[in-house]
From Swiss-Prot:
Biased composition (Polar residues): 319-332, 340-351, 384-395, 443-454, 1356-1369, 1387-1399
Biased composition range(s): Low complexity: 18-35, 164-185, 197-231, 352-383, 396-407, 417-433, 604-653, 660-686, 881-911, 918-961, 1047-1061, 1112-1167, 1205-1218, 1231-1334, 1370-1386, 1400-1424, 1432-1451
Record Pfam families: BET, Bromodomain
Gene Ontology biological-process annotations: chromatin remodeling; regulation of DNA-templated transcription
Name the record gives this protein: Bromodomain-containing protein DDB_G0270170
One Gene Ontology term, aspect cellular component: chromatin
Gene Ontology MF: a single term: lysine-acetylated histone binding
Length: 1578
């Protein structure tokens, strides 16, 4: 039954009682008046006590006030009606009756609250509920709990009412006026609980004040008048009705006072009475007459709190970012709501700081009347000292935790504690008892049978303006008229209290930002063993002063490791406050305790913040009396959990004054920043009741310690006892493990890799695995991951601890899991592995014997020395043979002996220099296995063979650098067929190509060689294929076939071979050199070659380039002709006799070890030229210096170094040695050495330059005849044409023809002499005049580099046109770029200083090549202008490049044209090769597509067949089923014929019905079955 229904039932009962008893004796008017009055009284009481949406939540005080008002009303009515028959006894009875009625209504309301929890939710102002309301009903509750009331009118009063009807009717108007006048006086106590000292006829109406906790609303405000309908029940109006509309009820106080308006009749002399019936009598009356309904009053018994299961101890986890620990709700005015619900037992004593003293009538602010009465009565019996009591301070405006939900707190025995003090201005204190944690959700209002209350503490301190005065008031319903006076006094007290709170609310608004929520607490007495300390009460309170307190810093937030809803664990710091014996004259030590309300749990989580404060003045005087706990260091007093800013941390010492001490210099003695202490009070009486013993809980340790956060139970949880061994407390540091720990780590890694290791790699999570009792069984968990982290971080001091932790992992697993569990078995297997490997860890491995480092070095150096010695011997023989041959060739021609005396000795092979470089002795010059010109085609052929043999090793080493496309099986088959068709003379070359890559095993002499092309790699196959193609194209003459593989790159790659392969190669080369060197003649330059020794080349990095070892000033030996003609640029070259016997063979066959351009001495060509520049296609006039040997390290603007990789073309890489400096004394200054592989014939000619059927037009300068010299290798170079080289000032032309024409040569000499007469130059300053003698030239030694990427040509580079169509045009300006077999090769010859040399080496298949110019722009003023009569000389577009004499440049340009043709041919070959590869790829793709299509068709066919098969099977199955059905139908037909109608089987009947249903038309009539009725036997 809801609250409203209960109230309506009570009203109906009372209406029926009064109305039906008065029907026989009174008229309708009197009954109407009586019922109206009675309903009005009940209505007023109901409106006061109701806690639904029509009553203010603070109705407890209003109800209490209404009781007092009723008494005062009765008192006033009795004083005005002294002539009444009943007198004061009736008045007393009326008061008692009203109190009883109110109590019954309250009981009903409280019962309704239990069933209807939404009462407080529907209230608009739940923040101002006065919790003292629930205690009013306890006084007569026991007496009234078993009494049911039935109201009726007295028979005598009804008779008197009937006799006085006429008189009452006559005087009705007059009495009504008198009643209305008296009504204002009678109803005054109902509308205002006014103070007796200041009575007024029209007192002010108290309105609802939401900021007050005790404000009540008793003003009735309704706009509806009293209903006059007798039979209808009055509806409940709003909260109140105006006093002018209320019916006159109790007293009609007229002048004669002879008649009194009563409930039954207006003329009744007696007051209607209410008889109290026992439940038995009420039941009997209800049974006798249906007019009476017995409604028993049943009180709900208080539910006993169920015993909760034991809480699981849990480890608290500190977390900064968990939800805030307290809830703060504010009103519209910005004030904090005091959300203390009306269901708590704990009375809240509120007081706000008031800056102005209050009058004595306004100082009763601290207690609630009923509670204080109980405390006052119990005070004398409790004067002895008790253990410390926990006291909560709740300042107005903050929420009391865990009260808004209507949950009942844990009941405590009635132990009121009253600390009274004299009436002096006191500090505003808000004191409430600390609430205990409870899971009960019952409201305290439902616990009416318990009259016990929690201890109440009234604290007053004489420091501020308001005083706390306790006024005990005893309410005894059975007492005499003195009770009325006490009730009136209590009314005045409550009014003062309301006014005080109303005034304090205004102050609270101003100081809201400075108020904090604190809680006074005592130390945990369970941990104190000293009885003396227990007896000494420690009252630790915190008083806030709004003018000095800063807002409290946010507390640390915590989160449980597990669920938040299982239990409510209080978080406390390990360091707690310690109770200190406080003598009466000593100041009170203060601590602050912040009470927070968790948003989720709404639990009372209180964090004790110990701030042991000592007054500065008194601490010095009484420092002896303070226990040593007060002088704890700050780091113990201020635990790390507090998240306060540094400036807000209390200094903890008496010597550091705070802001409060600076501002408050008055009589109050302040302490640290967050506390203010009370002064000494000598007459303070402390009455503290001993708190009830709670369930034993582990308290925090007594002495503050700096430890991690623990739960309130002191960290008894096994989660907090997890083994810390092996765990790093600090961050893991970089630790260098000792050998024994390294072995431990290896053993641990072995355990990690074991197949049974996964369960032990990480820590056990009981909640994830569903083993919640794991930590009950396992006290010290451990896992391998933790052990590894600790081991790496240096967490283990000894190996025994490591072993102990490892064994702990296995023992834990075996302890928790039974022996049949797989984890137990896995742990056992891992433990076996550990125990087997751990002894090995303990055993120190024997240290290896110390190696003699010196001995190793000696052995290594000795091996290197042997290899170098062998190579030197072989190269000496090679050089001596080639030099002798060159000298003999020079002696054959008398015309140019002087000019080219040293050309043969100075010309050297680029490939041989790559392979090895000789180290000079004192003169320190280079020779790279110099190869010189041969006198005949046969000698040139043999020499080229020698050069190719020396370069074979480099080709094999560099083969890996070039990535060729994969050779297919078809290509291998085709290559094998082509090799079979080759002549027998070419087979040694094929074998040599294969031998160079060590692809064939060692063969015995004379044995048959079997070549399996399928076993060779692609590199060898590509070389063989290229060799075969060259033979087919006529590029390789049979008489000059090489015995080596095509050379690809420099010799730096040869060093990658091991020593054994080098030795074999060296032996092979020596044999070939000895065989090829026979018959060669010695030349006059043997002295030059014998004057220096060899140096083995050492590969250096790309960036280093080649370094000039030495260039002496005497290394240029000019001929007598050059000396007489002032060393003109024109040096006549005798092709193939003086220096270039092998030039053409080098270009075609890569067999020459010579440089095809023998430099003439150009030092004396120009007067202003000090620099000797040897560039890509030019060299200064060094008649005897090979083009690759004269190197200096003058910086160049673009240092292009790119060596050929596998294509063996000198034009494929350009070198610049400007990065390096000469370490020798005779270094020439400002030499710009740009060495291009195009100038240096390195055994690479065979693979790139094929001068087949090329017509090199050499223009004879005297006769102006174009003599075609065909470098046709297929014709063995038998075409002897004009092979004379004309050397201008800037161009050293190297003729590449094998045969020589003496007549033409002599003509060239004459022309050169004419040029000499025109051009007179002086030797460079760096050259001594004595050096121009016939001394042998000492070429420098060159250290070559590995391949370097080509650099772009700078803007100062001259662009030469190599287009053969421009050989007869004078203006050929555009530079042509051609591509090699694998990449583009840009040929941009750089004309820098004076002479131009051709690039005698063929074009390789290497990457982009450019010929760079030096940084210094060559001078052009000293160069002779071109001859205008020659139309065929090429022109130069670059303004920085010099001009050349037209009569001497034809042969050079023809050479470049031929080279350009070769590049084009190579490009064509490359394109063809790419086309072939593309076709192969397309064919493969087509084959793959065909295969995929074939597979797809096959899959479709398979699917189709499977589908057809399924269809056939389904058809067969269907036919079978149909046949079975047909047979069944036939059988049924036969059975039907055999059986009669009356003997039809059930199956047959069902079949008939089924067939009928199948055949029936859907639109036809429904099936009507006539069923035989079954006779019921019953």
């Amino acid at each position: 039954m809801s609250l409203e229904q209960q109230d309506e039932t009570v009203v109906e009962e009372e209406t029926k009682t009064s109305f039906e008893t008065n029907n026989s004796t009174a008229n309708n008017t009197n009954n109407n008046t009586d019922n109206t009055y009675k309903e009005e009284i009940l209505k007023s009481t109901e409106s006061i006590t109701r806690n639904d949406d029509k009553v203010d939540p603070t109705s407890a005080t209003a109800l209490e006030k209404d009781i007092i008002n009723n008494g005062e009303y009765s008192g006033s009515s009795s004083s005005s009606g002294n002539n009444n028959i009943n007198g004061s006894n009736n008045i007393k009875n009326i008061v008692i009756e009203k109190v009883e009625q109110l109590e019954r209504v309250v009981v009903n309301n409280n019962n309704g609250d239990e069933n209807n929890k939404d009462i407080h939710d529907s209230s608009n102002n739940t923040e101002d509920i006065d919790i003292s309301k629930s205690h009013i009903i306890k006084y007569d509750k026991d007496e009234m709990s078993t009494i049911s009331t039935i109201h009726y009118s007295d028979d005598e009063s009804s008779k008197e009412k009937q006799d006085n009807i006429n008189s009452n009717n006559n005087n009705n108007k007059n009495k009504n006026e008198q009643i209305i006048n008296s009504e204002n006086i009678l109803d005054t106590p109902m509308t205002e609980a006014s103070d007796q000292t200041t009575p007024s006829d029209t007192p002010p109406t108290l309105t609802n004040n939401t900021s007050s906790t005790t404000t009540t609303t008793t003003t009735n405000n309704t706009t509806t008048a009293a209903t006059t309908t007798t039979n209808s029940r009055r509806k409940r109006n709003s909260l109140s009705t105006p006093s002018s509309e209320m019916d006159p009820v109790l007293d009609s106080t007229s002048e004669n006072n002879t008649t009194r308006k009563t409930r039954g009749s207006r003329n009744s002399k007696k007051e209607p009475e209410e008889l109290l019936l026992t439940p038995e009598q009420a039941k009997e009356l209800s049974n006798k007459s249906k007019k009476w309904i017995y409604v028993p009053i049943i009180e709900a018994e208080a539910k006993k709190e169920e015993v909760l299961p034991a809480k699981r101890d849990r480890k608290q986890v500190f977390n900064e970012n968990i939800f805030s620990s307290s809830r703060k709700s504010t009103t519209k005015g910005g004030e904090k709501k005091n959300d203390t619900a009306s269901t708590t037992n704990t009375p809240i004593i509120t007081a706000q700081q008031n800056t102005t003293p209050l009058s004595p009538t306004q100082t009763t602010t601290t207690t609630t009347t009923p509670t204080t009465t109980t405390a006052q009565q119990n005070t004398p019996a409790q004067t002895e000292s008790k253990p410390p009591t926990t006291i909560s301070i709740n300042i107005k405006g903050s929420k009391s935790p865990k009260t808004t939900g209507g949950k009942q707190q844990k009941p405590t025995p009635p132990s009121p504690v009253v600390i009274s003090q004299p009436v002096v201005p006191s500090t505003p204190v808000v004191a409430t008892t600390k609430k205990t944690n409870s899971r009960s959700k019952r409201s305290t209002a439902n616990n009416n049978s318990e009259t016990t209350q929690t201890p109440e503490v009234v604290i007053s301190a004489p420091t501020t303006t308001t005083a706390a005065i306790t006024t005990p008031i005893n309410i005894t319903p059975s007492s005499d008229s003195a009770t009325i006076q006490q009730l009136q006094q209590s009314i005045s007290m409550l009014e003062d209290k309301i006014r005080l709170i109303s005034s304090n609310n205004k102050v609270a608004t101003e100081i809201l930002n400075n108020t904090i929520t604190t809680t006074t607490t005592t130390a945990a007495t369970s941990a104190i063993k000293d009885e003396e300390i227990i007896e000494n009460t420690e009252l630790q309170t915190t008083f806030t002063k709004s003018s000095t307190l800063a807002p409290p810093s946010s507390e640390r937030k915590y989160s449980n490791l597990y669920s938040d809803d299982e239990d409510d664990t209080e978080m406390v710091d390990v360091s707690v406050s310690i109770p200190i014996p406080i003598p009466i004259p000593t100041p009170t030590q203060t601590t602050t305790k912040k009470t927070t309300l968790s948003k989720k749990r709404k639990s009372n989580t209180s964090t004790i913040i110990p701030t042991t404060t000592i007054q500065q003045e008194q601490g010095q005087e009484q420092g002896q009396q303070q226990p040593p706990q007060q002088q704890q260091p700050p780091q113990q007093q201020q635990p790390p959990q507090q998240q306060q800013p540094p400036q807000q941390q209390p200094p903890q010492q008496s010597t550091s004054p705070s802001k409060t001490q600076q501002e408050n210099t008055s009589s109050t003695t302040t302490t640290t920043t967050t506390t203010t202490t009370t002064t000494n009070t000598e007459d303070t009486t402390t009455v503290i009741d001993k708190k009830p013993k709670k369930k034993p809980r582990h308290s925090a340790p007594l002495i503050p310690q700096i430890k991690p956060r623990l739960p309130l139970n002191g960290g008894s949880s096994e989660r907090a006892q997890r083994s810390s061994r092996g765990r790093m407390g600090k961050a893991m540091r970089d630790v260098v493990l000792t050998p024994v720990f390294k072995r431990c780590l290896d053993l641990l890694e072995e355990l990690f890799e074991h197949q049974h290791s996964p369960p032990f790699l990480v820590a056990v999570d009981p909640y994830a695995l569903g083993i919640l009792d794991y930590f009950d069984v396992i006290k010290h968990p451990m896992d391998l991951g933790t052990i590894k982290a600790s081991l790496i971080g240096g967490g283990y001091d000894t190996i025994d601890k490591f072993a102990e932790d490892c064994r702990l992992v296995f023992s834990n697993a075996k302890t928790y899991n039974p022996s049949t569990n797989p984890v137990h078995i896995m742990a056992q297997s891992l433990e076996d592995v550990f125990e087997k490997g751990f002894p090995k860890v303990l055993i120190e491995p024997p240290s290896p014997p110390p190696k003699n480092v010196d001995q190793e070095k000696i052995e290594k150096l000795s091996n290197d020395l042997k290899n170098v010695t062998k190579e030197l011997e072989k190269f000496k023989k090679d050089d001596s043979n080639s030099i002798n041959n060159n000298n003999n060739n020079n002696n054959n021609y008398n015309n140019n002996n002087n000019n080219n005396n040293n050309n043969s000795s100075s010309s050297s092979s680029r490939s041989s220099s790559r392979k090895s470089h000789s180290s000079g002795s004192s003169s320190s010059h280079r020779s790279g296995s110099s190869r010189s010109s041969r006198g005949s085609s046969s000698s040139s052929s043999s020499s080229s063979s020698s050069s190719s043999s020396s370069s074979s090793s480099s080709s094999s080493s560099s083969s890996n650098n070039k990535k060729y496309p994969k050779v297919t099986t078809e290509e291998k088959t085709k290559l094998g067929a082509e090799i079979t068709q080759l002549p027998v003379d070419l087979l040694p070359s094929i074998l040599q190509i294969i031998h160079n890559t060590n692809s064939l095993p060692e063969q015995k002499p004379g044995s048959e060689v079997v070549i399996d092309l399928m076993k060779f790699d692609d590199d060898i196959l590509r070389r063989l294929s290229k060799f075969v193609e060259q033979y087919k194209n006529g590029e390789i003459p049979q008489h000059a076939l090489p015995l080596s593989a095509p050379s690809s790159t420099h010799s730096s790659h040869s060093s990658s071979h091991d020593s054994s392969s080098n030795i074999r190669e060296i032996e092979k080369l020596q044999k070939q050199l000895d065989r090829l060197g026979k018959g060669q003649q010695n030349s006059s330059s043997s002295s030059s070659s014998s004057s220096h020794s060899k140096r083995i080349s050492k590969p250096i990095s790309k960036a280093r380039g080649r370094k000039v070892i030495s260039t002496s000033s005497s290394n240029l030996n000019n001929s007598s002709n050059n000396i007489n003609n002032n060393n003109n640029n024109i040096n006549n070259y005798n092709n193939n006799n003086n220096y270039n016997n092998n030039n053409n063979n080098n270009l075609n066959n890569n067999n020459n070890n010579n440089i095809n351009s023998n430099l003439n001495n150009n030092l004396n060509n120009n007067n202003n030229k000090d620099d000797i520049v040897i560039d890509g296609f030019k060299k200064e006039n060094f008649s005897s210096i090979p083009e690759k040997d004269v190197e200096t390290d003058i910086s160049e603007s673009s240092d292009s170094e790119s060596d050929s990789e596998s294509g063996s073309s000198d034009s494929s890489s350009s070198y610049s040695d400007s990065d390096f400096s000469d370490s020798d004394n005779d270094r020439r200054r400002n030499y710009n050495n740009s060495y291009n592989n195009n100038n240096n014939n390195n055994n690479n000619n065979n693979s790139s330059n094929n001068f087949n059927n090329q017509n090199n037009s050499y223009n004879n300068s005297n006769n102006n005849n174009n003599n075609n010299s065909s470098n046709n290798n297929n014709n063995n170079n038998n075409n002897n044409s004009n092979n004379n080289n004309s050397n201008n000032n800037n161009n050293n032309v190297n003729n590449n023809n094998n045969n020589h024409n003496n007549n033409n040569h002599n003509n060239n000499i004459n022309n050169n002499n004419n040029n000499i007469n025109n051009n007179t130059t002086q030797p460079s300053p760096s050259q001594q005049s004595t050096s121009l003698t016939n001394e042998p030239i000492k070429p420098p030694t060159i250290l070559q580099t590995v391949k370097k990427p080509a650099l772009p040509v700078t803007g100062s580079v001259a662009s030469w046109s190599f287009d053969p169509t421009n050989n007869k045009e004078s203006s050929s300006s555009s530079s042509t770029s051609s591509t090699s077999s694998t990449s583009n090769t840009t040929l941009t010859p750089i004309i820098q200083q004076s002479s131009l040399t051709h690039a005698s080496s063929p074009i390789s298949s290497s990457t982009f090549v450019s010929f760079s110019s030096s940084s210094s722009t060559p001078p052009t003023n000293n160069l002779s202008p071109p001859s205008p009569g020659l139309p065929n000389s090429p022109s130069i577009n670059s303004p920085s490049s010099p001009s050349a004499n037209n009569n001497n440049t034809d042969s050079a340009w023809n050479h470049f044209k031929a080279k350009n043709i070769t590049l084009k041919q190579k490009e064509k070959e490359r394109v063809l090769q790419e086309e072939v590869l593309r076709k192969e790829r397309e064919e493969k793709e087509e084959e793959l597509k065909k295969e995929e299509e074939k597979k797809r068709i096959e899959m479709e066919e398979i699917k189709r067949l499977a589908k057809e098969k399924e269809e056939r099977e389904a058809e067969e199955t269907r036919k079978q089923i149909e046949s079975e059905r047909a047979a069944a139908r036939e059988a049924r037909e036969k059975e039907k014929l055999n059986n009669s109608k009356g003997n039809m089987s059930f199956q047959y009947q069902m079949d008939v019905m089924a067939s009928f249903e199948d055949n029936i038309d859907s639109s036809g009539s429904l099936l009507n079955l006539q069923l035989k009725p079954i006779e019921d036997p019953l």
